[in-house]
C-alpha cells in the first residue's frame, strides 16, 4: 500500500531501511530491472532494451550532480550561494517524505494502466501555497478524489489509481523570468518554495529557506493524507458521507447519492453472503503523491539510495513529471530524471515531435519497464485529434510501453473579459472526448486523467451543470496560479469519463 503504511515496520523498527540513506555523490550504474509484471491477454510487455533509438545524453554515467553539467532551464538564481548550499545540506539530512517501496508499488499499478487494466486519477492544486495550507483544504480535495474514484471504478469496473498533485506541488515554470507592472520590473513568482507572490522586491528574491518550509508542509500534508487513507475516513462504508455540503443539493450530488446507494446495496449483499466488509481493502485506500520535477536542487537534496535495490529514488514524492518547458533531451531535468527509479511523467503538447518523444522515452526508460513512463498529453481538442495519433503510432512502432493520460486543463486556458485566467468546462470535456476517440481509433488504452482541481467551492472555470459565467469568476477566485475545477465540476467530469469507460467495456452505448 502507499498511504496506508505506518511509520513502523512489522518487525517494530522505527523506519524501514529503504530510502533512508543520505545522498552519495558517486556514479550510479545503469539500473537493472527484473520484472514478472502481470499482463493481459492482448498485450505482452517487451523487457529487452530498445535498440532502435539511442540518444547520446544517456550514454554518459549518471550521478546525483551530473545534471549540473547540462543546460538548465526554469531554475531560480539564488543571490546567496553559501546560504543555498547550507539549506541543501540540511535538507539532505532530513528523513525521506516517501519510501522507495511505495514508489515501486505505484509503478506496478501504473503498469496495469498501461495495459488497460486500471485507470489513473491524478488531481490537485495547480500550485500549493503556504497561505492556504489547512487541514480542511487537504480533506476536501482528498474527499472529492475519493468520490471521483468510486464513480470511475463503478463505471470502468477496474481499479482506480489515485495520485494527488499534493504534498510537494509548489514550484511553477514561467514563460518570462520577469514580471512588469507600472514600469516596475521584478523577478517572476516561481512558487512558494522559491519566492513570494507579492509584487515587491523583497518578496520576489529567491529564498532558499522556503525549501525547508515546503518540506515541512509536504510532510504535514502527507501525514494527514495517510491518516485519512488508513484511519477509517476512506472506508467504503462511508461512501454516503463523502458529499461536500455545496455539492449536496446539485445534479452531481443527486447522481452521486444514487451511485452510493448502489454501492451500499452491493456491500449489504456481500455481508448477507458471509463476505466480510471489514477487510483492509474495504476500509482503507491507496493514495500516492506527485509533483513537477522543477526545482532540481531541492529534488537532489531529497534523493536517497534505496538499500534494498541499490537504486536512487527521489523521496520528495512517489511520482514526478517533467514539464513542457524542461524536457530537452540534453537538459538538466532529463539528466536528473534518468537516474532515479521513481515512476515518471512526461508532459506533452502539440509541439512534441513523435521521434523526439521516442528518444525521450528511451533515455528515461531504456529497459522498457511497464509503469515507468506516463505520457500526459495537453494540447486542446482539435490538436489532440491531429497530433495524438502520430505520437501513439511512433511509440507503438518503437515497441515502447507507456501509460497514456489526458491533461485537458493546460491546453484550454483563456483570458476572460474581466482579465482573469479561466478554462471552459465544455473545452475540457471536448479534449477528453477527443482523447478517448483517438485511443479507440488507434486500438490503444486511455490510461488516465490529470486534473487541476480543488475540493473548495471556487469559481475559476466557467461552465458545468451549475453554470459558472464570466460574471461569477470574481466571487470566489482564489487560485495562486491557474484556474481549477471545483468539486461539483470535477465530479461531473468523473461521471462523463465513467460513462466513456463503461462504453469501452460494454460497447458504444454511451457518449462523453
From Swiss-Prot:
One of its GO terms (biological process) is chorismate biosynthetic process. Residues 37-57 are annotated as: Disordered. Disruption phenotype: Normal floral volatile benzenoids and phenylpropanoids (FVBP) emission. The lineage of its organism: Eukaryota, Viridiplantae, Streptophyta, Embryophyta, Tracheophyta. Mostly expressed in leaves and stems, and, to a lower extent, in roots, stigmas, anthers, petal tubes, petal limbs and sepals. The gene is DAHP2. Its main location: plastid. The keyword Metal-binding applies. Mn(2+) binds at residues 126, 410, 452, 482. Binds 1 divalent metal cation per subunit that could be manganese. Residues 1-57 form a transit peptide. GO terms for molecular function: 3-deoxy-7-phosphoheptulonate synthase activity; metal ion binding. Coiled coil: none annotated. Involved in the production of volatile organic compounds (VOCs). Catalyzes an aldol-like condensation reaction between phosphoenolpyruvate (PEP) and D-erythrose 4-phosphate (E4P) to generate 3-deoxy-D-arabino-heptulosonate 7-phosphate (DAH7P) and inorganic phosphate. It catalyses: D-erythrose 4-phosphate + phosphoenolpyruvate + H2O = 7-phospho-2-dehydro-3-deoxy-D-arabino-heptonate + phosphate. This is Phospho-2-dehydro-3-deoxyheptonate aldolase 2, chloroplastic. PANTHER family: PHOSPHO-2-DEHYDRO-3-DEOXYHEPTONATE ALDOLASE 1, 2 (PTHR21337), PHOSPHO-2-DEHYDRO-3-DEOXYHEPTONATE ALDOLASE 2, CHLOROPLASTIC (PTHR21337:SF28).
